[in-house]
Amino acid sequence: MAVLYTCVVIEYSVLILKKKNLFYLFLMKLQKLKNIGMVVININNIKKILENKITFLSDIEKATYIIENQSEYWDPYTLSHGYPGIILFLSASEKVFHKDLEKVIHQYIRKLGPYLESGIDGFSLFSGLSGIGFALDIASDKQYSYQSILEQIDNLLVQYVFDFLNNDALEVTPTNYDIIQGFSGIGRYLLNRISYNYNAKKALKHILNYFKTIHYSKDNWLVSNEHQFLDIDKQNFPSGNINLGLAHGILGPLSLTALSKMNGIEIEGHEEFLQDFTSFLLKPEFKNNNEWFDRYDILENYIPNYSVRNGWCYGDTGIMNTLLLSGKALNNEGLIKMSKNILINIIDKNNDDLISPTFCHGLASHLTIIHQANKFFNLSQVSTYIDTIVRKIISHYSEESSFMFQDIEYSYGQKIYKNKVGILEGELGVLLALLDYIDTQNQSRKNWKNMFLIT
């Protein structure tokens, strides 16, 4: 009996302990939900945040003063960090909220005038002339306004494309082919202009042929050691690497090749090239632990000890979106299914390394890419996950600050908070992601997501 009594006491104690543990786990779950801003998503609250920013930007003199004097990394004429980003946000807001913001938008466009008159340094999408053209084209009212200046920009870009790419000695470097600085970004702008400028179509095809030449060359997309951006990369990749990102890697040219076909622009052997290029991305050595590398060491000696963040610049989110574009362009159900499986794998992770709400490597791009993909797949579990990401983003919102969302990065183990306005790393990218989240309209029209080659 004593033994039986002891067993009963032990079992009862274990039961109590289990209940305590369950209660503890429940409390931890509540705390976790609290930590990510677990509030019921109220679309009206999101709209209020967006409308407050519209009101702020509509007071042009005050907004300009605060932005120019308090924003870090402000670069006035660039799409990534300047006035073109404001123009894109207001243009998108005008369509979603059915507001007449034409006069406000025009005032910000006028601020670009002095820079255009004195000459823009470079032709790139994120920091050059095509970025200004991109913003003006999106803001153009049914393609009637700003056409004169757009035609001038188009002509300069077309001339640049032919002059630059007629050089047979071109080296394979991200600054030549990527979205940020290279021809993937310029090509995406030209794709938006093909209906209004025949030469834009010719220049775009020239870019696609350039990509095709790289792909079938001896070293194809290998970026040599001397063309690595950072000294640490020169150490890690002595014989070079293949960049597998969307911002600086092969996903940019591949996405543009797919998008061009989807829009009826093809070069000789386009479909075969797109198939081969997509197959190249799927090489098994480009993956580690079922995730794509950000950069593949050609010597296969360097294996990073970190997990790649699933934002825009790198990560499986970009891989997923690019494969979806290729699948649609080629009408290939296998690629589409693969994209779907990657999407499910992404949402099964916690993605807690996305510490910043901003776009480049943060939650805003994570939300936008997954939300865009789920418009096609329409998976309920993805919709639930998207709501969780929105809550995380909203938890970073500051009502008191002139900058509603800050960019966050780690530096020597400490979180560093920076006030930035621009689309790429600042609050505008976050606000555009939230605007896209609440937008229920058909977005087959040209839109800001084109600049990231998400669409």
UniProtKB/Swiss-Prot annotation:
Keywords for this protein: Plasmid
Keyword Kinase: no
GO biological process: peptide modification
UniProt cross-references to SMART domains, sorted A to Z: LANC_like
UniProt similarity note: To B.subtilis SpaC and L.lactis NisC.
Function text: Involved in the post-translational modification of the lantibiotic epidermin.
CDD domains on file: LanC
Species per Swiss-Prot/TrEMBL record: Staphylococcus epidermidis
Protein's UniProt name: Epidermin biosynthesis protein EpiC
